[in-house]
Each structure stands twice: as C-alpha cells, then as structure tokens.
Curated annotation (Swiss-Prot):
It holds the Pfam family YidD. Could be involved in insertion of integral membrane proteins into the membrane. Residues 87-117 are annotated as: Disordered. NCBIfam families: membrane protein insertion efficiency factor YidD. PANTHER family: MEMBRANE PROTEIN INSERTION EFFICIENCY FACTOR-RELATED. This is Putative membrane protein insertion efficiency factor.
C-alpha cells in the first residue's frame, strides 16, 4: 500500500502542484513531507503524520521548518535484543558498567597526535 500512495503524491507534485505555486508555509512542503513520512514510516503512520501536517498548514499557522521525525524501534525490540544477549552470555545495554569502567570509543583511545588536524 506504500508505493501506490507514493505514486499519488508524485502525480500531485508533477501535475497539480506546479499550477498552484508555492503555497505551503512549511519547509519541506506538505507534499514532500508526506512522501518522506510514508516512505520512512509506512502507509498507516506516514498517512497519519501527513494528515496532521496538512491540518497544521493553514492561514493562521506561522509555518517554519518541520522535518519528518526519525523512525524509532519499538520498545519490545530492545527488550527482545537484551534477552537474547543475556541468553547468549554477551553484554547487555541494560547491564551497568563493570568496576566503574566506562566504555569509550576507538577515537578516544587514539592519541591526539595521531589524528589528522
């Protein structure tokens, strides 16, 4: 269902939108927002985000920059991953650091004179 909706938005952008001109108060425009929302979040949630955006785009709104929110993993996904790691004996994100050791990134372990300036 996602791809027919994306095709409808593209059809609107190529045919009707050029006739209306730039009337959206937001960046990106409502049609671009809708395309990104449906592409990123799927047909149901993307359509809901698009409808909410179109309702907010009215003569009384101030407009501005309004990007599509990033896709988040469901809460059960993290719980399942932690349970799987615990069963395999690996470290879990929920476990505290051992003996006060804070894991660092590889960049933090590299001496500063080695890194390019």
């Amino acid at each position: 269902m996602k791809y027919p909706l994306l095709a409808l938005i593209k059809l609107y952008q190529w045919t009707i939108s050029p006739l209306l001109g730039p009337v959206c108060k937001y960046y990106p425009s409502c049609s671009h927002y809708g395309y990104q929302a449906i592409d990123r979040h799927g047909a149901i949630k993307g359509t809901a985000l698009t409808a909410w955006r179109i309702l907010r785009c009215n003569p009384w709104s101030l407009g501005g920059v309004d990007h599509v929110p990033p896709r988040k993993r469901p809460r059960w996904h993290e719980m399942l991953r932690n349970a799987w790691r615990a069963r395999k004996g690996g470290p879990s994100a929920a476990e505290p650091a051992i003996e006060g050791h804070i894991p660092s990134s590889p960049a933090a372990e590299t001496p500063s004179h080695v890194q390019g300036a």
